[in-house]
Curated annotation (Swiss-Prot):
Protein name per Swiss-Prot or TrEMBL: UPF0210 protein Memar_2269
Top-level taxonomy: Archaea, Methanobacteriati, Methanobacteriota, Stenosarchaea group, Methanomicrobia
InterPro entries found in the cross-reference section: UPF0210
HAMAP family found in the cross-reference section: UPF0210
NCBIfam families in UniProt: PRK05313.1
Family: Belongs to the UPF0210 family.
Pfam family, one: DUF711
Length: 454
């Protein structure tokens, strides 16, 4: 029986508290598109993406109108291109042509991003992997909707430090290649440890080889809803606090489950997972930082921040997992600086540093995300930050990632405008002491002792 109070509560969550479904992401396998001829390969991937994705945007809009739940993004992820392009691509320029084909497919289907210009090099790098990675700066400069990711480590395999070194250089080169646009290419490039196969969120989404031919994955959001719920229990003990977050996360996830099932049924594509992540936006009131401050912190970055974030992350999982038949992806709280007004404010007031953000990544969903750093930051320093994050992920058996933006021509204290959901960010201080000799050693960091489970 429909309860009018619950109907009103849902309406309030959507209209006043910024509840939305952040993304419907269609994952598409390109394993059957391989060809030794580059033109044929490009034709195969374009045809498959546009055939399966042609109704994604219109279906999302229909569900929005029918149920009144905003669906912010409709996106596509594909099999990591390094796995399928080896026969067709013989040079970096060939890979850039593939990126342009992906970009055209994204435009023609109407999605705002397409992820999967990716390589999985957690234990070693093939010549194809390296060619794709070295093509990333040119590919992101030549496209508007293509997103790239590289997985450089895992708990089972350790960390590929040769790839870590290379990715520091690639981030720098991408910043240079897109410097006319505030180095925006780096906002579409993520370096992972323990990357999941079914992540619906950009820029790190790709369609893993363990997945079906096509699946629908949905990413929910709702920081504003949880913040409003916590306002009603201000000053209560931790038991009440945890229960409130958990119950609210359940309601938010049910909305995502409904949208996922509807999209799956209407498109005739299997439902994959709901990602429980709390994804903020630059809008006032849609902030993960706001939740932490509502718990009692004077500012994000204050002592207690990591504990508050750990509590939030755990209760979101506990509430959300009951609300969906399949949960996956990243599933936790995102802490992107440029996309969260509360994080931006904390950086500006001096409360939040990169080092504190790194500590927070030990207990939350992803990692150092959308952080603007000085444009003259050395590649070896970027590699060192990537290695630190990868170590956290490897040792703790969790996904971690780095999306740093060394903004060419900007320095400490400047503010960079990225626009849209990417927001804006103050340029943050990076530790000035070097780590080049450490990064230049090369080779691999072995997997941790507790990874041997067999």
């Amino acid at each position: 029986m429909i309860n009018i109070l619950e109907v009103n509560e849902t309406n309030k969550m959507i209209e006043q508290e910024k509840l939305d479904v952040r993304t419907i992401t269609l994952g598409i396998s390109l394993l059957d598109c391989c060809d030794s001829d580059l033109d044929a390969f490009n034709r195969n991937i374009y045809d498959k993406i546009t055939r399966l994705g042609k109704d994604l945007v219109s279906t999302g809009r229909e569900i929005e109108l029918e149920y009144g739940i905003p669906i912010v993004n409709k996106r596509i992820s594909v099999t990591p291109i390094a796995l399928v392009a080896g026969r067709a691509c013989r040079s970096e320029e060939d890979f850039v042509e593939v990126a342009k084909t992906l970009d055209k497919a994204a435009r023609d289907t109407g999605v705002n991003f397409l992820g999967g210009y990716s390589a999985i090099v957690s234990k070693g790098t093939t010549p194809t992997d390296e060619a794709l990675i070295r093509s990333i700066p040119a590919a992101l400069a030549a496209t508007g909707r293509v997103c790239s990711s590289v997985n450089i480590g895992s708990t089972k395999t350790g960390i590929n430090m040769d790839a870590v070194k290379l990715m520091g250089e690639i981030v720098r080169e991408t910043a240079e290649a897109t410097k006319e646009n505030n180095s925006l290419g780096c906002a579409k490039l993520v370096v992972f440890c323990n990357a999941p196969d079914d992540n619906p969120f950009m820029a790190g989404a790709f369609h893993g080889v363990s997945e079906a031919d096509a699946v629908i994955n949905v990413g929910v959001s709702g920081p504003g809803v949880i913040k409003h719920a916590l306002e009603d229990v201000r000053g209560k003990n931790f038991e009440v606090l945890c229960e409130t977050v958990k119950r609210t996360a359940f309601k938010v996830t049910r909305a995502g489950q409904l949208v996922a099932q509807e999209a799956s049924e209407r498109l005739g594509i299997p439902f994959g997972i709901v990602d429980l992540s709390l994804a903020p936006t630059p809008s006032v009131g849609d902030s993960v930082a706001g939740i932490l401050e509502e718990m009692g912190l004077e500012s994000v970055g204050a002592p207690g921040t990591t504990a508050a974030l750990a509590l939030l992350n755990d209760q979101v999982k506990k509430g959300g997992i009951m609300a969906s038949s399949f949960v996956g992806g990243l599933s936790g709280a995102f802490i992107p600086v440029s996309e969260d007004q509360g994080m931006i404010d904390a950086v500006n007031r001096g409360a939040l540093t990169i080092e504190k953000l790194e500590a927070m990544t030990c207990v939350c969903s992803v990692g150092l995300d959308m952080i603007a750093i000085p444009g003259d930051t050395p590649a070896s320093t970027i590699s060192g930050i990537i290695a630190d994050e990868a170590a956290i992920g490897m040792i703790n058996n969790k996904t971690t990632a780095v999306r740093l933006i060394p903004v060419i021509g900007k320095d400490l204290g400047d503010t960079v405008e990225f626009g849209g959901l990417l927001g804006h960010a103050p340029v943050q201080r990076v530790n000035g002491f070097g780590c080049a000799d450490f990064i230049n050693r090369g080779g691999r960091i072995p997997a941790p002792i507790h990874s041997f489970k067999n």
